[in-house]
Structures are given as structure tokens and as C-alpha cells.
């Protein structure tokens, strides 16, 4: 009887051990394995304007004439169970323009460089340099529908160096809070400037805030699926600097996908500045309305984008010849983008 009792206890222990082993194995199998990734883009283009001098709109990127280079963008990332990092470097004219706030040396290559840690479920802390959370458009040409960029994107922040906390509050509700150096100052805080940022995400719509000494920007970025193949993106922003200087704008991005390989999209942007902000004029107030029509042909990882753009300003800001200025400008761009 005593031996039988010992046998039953031993059998129970073995059963529990095997069960816990299976459960541990199932847990290990369901947990995502750490991953190391290498990705990026390469882009190049041809640009011309329908004027005697090949002047370009005063927006970032895609503003060189004739056959021109965009950038090579290489991203190395590692994602573990609770932590990871991103190292994002850029080469070429577009990359140099994107990191214009760098003081020099190797930092001129750094587009993003940050590490993150999930301190709890739905709470992530990120430290380093990362692209901005404001605006509809981004630095990578593969992530934008239009190849040329808007005035709102061009004169808003490109990146921030600091710390931020991302909170997942519900399935479609998120909150980000951050403390940053001076906007676009990549390496360090050289002027003891501190900015504060916040983002509230509600069902795919985002309210963004960036504030610091002599700077305040409020931004809305979002969009709606009007139909299965028709999307409408929206961006609106207003920024106030020292004194009465500042800018504001709104843009609509209707995009129609006609097949697996072709889509067509329009960007209509109204942009205004006050007290010589400098995007359009150096003194006084000015505004500009632009229409950009872009086609997107895709084959695998390759995308071909022909684009026609018209800018119309409130004053003659475009130097269309050595002796003549105009209040409007028409441009044409053909871009090739490869993503991997």
C-alpha cells in the first residue's frame, strides 16, 4: 500500500512536470522571436519647370533641376521581446536636406538613431533621435504618395532628439508625450532649449502638439476610406513663432487605386505665412496654393511616379527668368523609387 502511494505521487509529479513543460513550450512558441531587419529605399528623379529658368517651388526635396539624385536610405533595426533599436542613415541630396540641423561629421548621415523599451504592456519609452510625429508627409519618398513635398511639411519639424513615452490606451486610442531638444538638432542640446510634444490618436486621426520657447504648433493629421479604392488624407496645421511670425495651412490628399499596379492622387494645399516667416517672402504676409497630380506605377519593389505641379502665390515670388518674376509656376517631375 505504501509503495502504491509512492507510485501515485511519483506519477502525479511526472504528469505535472510534463504538463508544465508542454505549457512552457507552447508559451515559447507563441512568443515572437527576436528579429533583425535591414531595409531602405533608393530614389532618383528628373525635374523641370515650364519657364525660362528652371526654378523650383520653395519646398523641400525634389527641387534640383534636370536629372538628379534623391537619396539612399539604409535602416538597421532589432526587435526583441521588450526592447529594440533603429539605426537609420541617409546619403545624397535628399538625405542632406533631411538632416540639415546636424553640426557636421558623421552625424550628417543620421536620420534616426534610437532605442526603446516596453516598461509595461502598452507603454513604450523611446530615447534618441526620431522623425517627427507632426504632419502627413515624411522624409522617406516610399511612404509619401506625392514625390514633391508640401509647404507645411517643408517648414515644420523633420526630427526630434529626446525621450518620448507611447501609451496604447485602447485598440484605436493612443497617447504620446515627449521632451525634446531644439527641433532638427540631431546630436545634442547646444542651446539649452527644451520643447514638449504630445500626440493623441483616435481611430486613425491624430492631434499633434509641439511647444517651446517662442514656438507653438498645433497639427491635425488623418484620413478616411471613402470607398474600398478611394482614400482621402487630410492635414491642417498652425504654427506661431516669436512676435507675429508664423504659418498655417491645410491640404487634402484624395487617392484612387485603380489596380494592383496603378494609383493616382492629388494634393491640394493652401499655405499662408505672416510677418515675413520666410517660406514665401522675407517681409510681410504671403500665401500660396498648389495642386500636385501624381501617378504611381508599381512593379514589385519598384515604383515609378510621374508628377505635374502648379503653384500660385499671392505675389511674384518665382524667378522664371534672369529679369522676370511671376506669381505662378508649373513643374514636372518623374521619379523612380526602389524599396527593400
List PLM regions with ranges.
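Outer-membrane beta-barrel pore domains
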Residues: 51, 58-64, 95-106, 204, ...
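Glycine- and aromatic-enriched membrane insertion/assembly motifs of diderm outer-membrane
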Residues: 62-94, 252
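Residues on the lipid-exposed face of transmembrane beta-strands in outer-membrane beta-barrel proteins
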Residues: 40, 44, 69-78, 112-117, ...
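Outer-membrane beta-barrel channels and translocator barrels
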Residues: 33, 79-83, 120-122, 170-172, ...
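Bacterial N-terminal signal peptides that target proteins for export
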Residues: 1-8
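Outer-membrane beta-barrel biogenesis signature
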Residues: 6, 21-42, 47-61, 131, ...
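Bacterial N-terminal signal peptides
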Residues: 9-18
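Surface-exposed coil loops of outer-membrane beta-barrel proteins
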Residues: 45, 50-66, 95-112, 120-202, ...
Amino acid at each position: 500500500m505504501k509503495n502504491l502511494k509512492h507510485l501515485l505521487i511519483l506519477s502525479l509529479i511526472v504528469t505535472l512536470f510534463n504538463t508544465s513543460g508542454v505549457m512552457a513550450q507552447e508559451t515559447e512558441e507563441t512568443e515572437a522571436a527576436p528579429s533583425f531587419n535591414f531595409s531602405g529605399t533608393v530614389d532618383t528623379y528628373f525635374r523641370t519647370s515650364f519657364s525660362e529658368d528652371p526654378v523650383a517651388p520653395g519646398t523641400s526635396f525634389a527641387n534640383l533641376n534636370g536629372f538628379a539624385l534623391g537619396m539612399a536610405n539604409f535602416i538597421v533595426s532589432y526587435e526583441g521581446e521588450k526592447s529594440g533599436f533603429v539605426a537609420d542613415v541617409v546619403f545624397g541630396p535628399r538625405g542632406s536636406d533631411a538632416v540639415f540641423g546636424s553640426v557636421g561629421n558623421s552625424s550628417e548621415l543620421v536620420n534616426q538613431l534610437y532605442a526603446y523599451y516596453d516598461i509595461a504592456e502598452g507603454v513604450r519609452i523611446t530615447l534618441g533621435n526620431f522623425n517627427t510625429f507632426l504632419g502627413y508627409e515624411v522624409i522617406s519618398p516610399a511612404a509619401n504618395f506625392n514625390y514633391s513635398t508640401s509647404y507645411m511639411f517643408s517648414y515644420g519639424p523633420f526630427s526630434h532628439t529626446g525621450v518620448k513615452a507611447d501609451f496604447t490606451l485602447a485598440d484605436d486610442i493612443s497617447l504620446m508625450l515627449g521632451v525634446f531638444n531644439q527641433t532638427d538638432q540631431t546630436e545634442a542640446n547646444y542651446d539649452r532649449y527644451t520643447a514638449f510634444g504630445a500626440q493623441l490618436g483616435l481611430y486613425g486621426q491624430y492631434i499633434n502638439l509641439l511647444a517651446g520657447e517662442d514656438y507653438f504648433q498645433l497639427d491635425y493629421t488623418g484620413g478616411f476610406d471613402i470607398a474600398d479604392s478611394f482614400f482621402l488624407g487630410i492635414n491642417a496645421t498652425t504654427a506661431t513663432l516669436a512676435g507675429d511670425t508664423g504659418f498655417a495651412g491645410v491640404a487634402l490628399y484624395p487617392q484612387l487605386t485603380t489596380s494592383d499596379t496603378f494609383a493616382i492622387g492629388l494634393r491640394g494645399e493652401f499655405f499662408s505665412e505672416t510677418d515675413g516667416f520666410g517660406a514665401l517672402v522675407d517681409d510681410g504676409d504671403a500665401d500660396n496654393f498648389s495642386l500636385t497630380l501624381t501617378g504611381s506605377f508599381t512593379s514589385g519593389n519598384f515604383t515609378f511616379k510621374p508628377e505635374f505641379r502648379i503653384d500660385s502665390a499671392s505675389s511674384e515670388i518665382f524667378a522664371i527668368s534672369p529679369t522676370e518674376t511671376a506669381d505662378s509656376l508649373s513643374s514636372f517631375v518623374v521619379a523612380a523609387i526602389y524599396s527593400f
